């Protein structure tokens, strides 16, 4: 039992999420996803040395519905991490700490990552 007169912190029950904290958390998560995705891509390229049949097996995966979701997710993760990293570099220079500016740059990162993902997808499909 807590018999002290100190107030107890309600912690997460009253915490209001801010866009800056979400961008920071997702920056870390996308960094991990990017490393895992690059490992998978390196393994895919490494399968070239084991012959055409093993390489075709991975190609079948990438042409499947799940494979396309993986590629799209990896493209979004890369785009988000890139734009969020640029945002963090600007913050490191001391700019953008005002609440309004921080919210606007956070929204720019989210929308920009989606736009870059669509552009990568269109370029990859040969539509642009």
Model-predicted segments: where are they?
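Membrane-embedded alpha-helical bundles that constitute the cytochrome b-like, heme-associated redox core
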Residues: 1-128
């Amino acid at each position: 039992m807590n018999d002290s007169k100190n107030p107890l912190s309600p912690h997460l029950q009253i915490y209001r999420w801010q866009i800056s904290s979400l961008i920071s958390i997702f920056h870390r998560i996308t960094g991990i996803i990017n490393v895992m995705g690059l490992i998978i891509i390196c393994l895919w390229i490494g399968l070239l040395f084991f012959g055409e049949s093993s390489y075709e097996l991975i190609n079948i995966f990438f042409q499947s519905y799940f494979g396309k979701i993986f590629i799209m997710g990896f493209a979004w993760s890369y785009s988000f991490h890139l734009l969020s990293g640029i945002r963090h570099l600007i913050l490191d220079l001391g700019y953008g700490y005002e609440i309004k500016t921080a919210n606007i740059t956070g929204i720019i990162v989210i929308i920009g990552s989606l736009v870059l993902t669509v552009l990568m997808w269109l370029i990859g499909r040969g539509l642009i």
